[in-house]
């Protein structure tokens, strides 16, 4: 379905969770650090005192660097990214003390190149939280109503939410965005 939607378009960086279906859609992938922090906290709560606590600290450091990107030079960001990669290598050499920590470390070894892409790509966020917040109303609607009775209803609802979310990004109310779209003047995201 995603391939049908994107067609030949391939984003430079795809921000995603660690789900296999989220791999390969962009030239590069940035994993959501918020999800990884949650996974690390689960490992800590399950008793890991080896890998997970240090991994949490490393992710928080990366997020802090990311928040400072506007004031840092590209060369400085590249140095920070290389430093984060070196620290990750050292962390991956630490033996986790609980099964949840071992599982987390195995998963991170498989996707280690996807953790710090955002450091050197200024327009890439460290998390996909904004996207998930945009999906939340649809998820709530589906849970409350039990879903849609027709494909037409689902498409219409998705289109309306898309117009509203795009309008919000451009400082318009839901009503303004819908009125403009229905009048044939939709807000277009620049190519």
Regions flagged by a language model, labelled:
Residues 1-191:
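Catalytic center-proximal scaffold of phosphoryl-transfer enzymes
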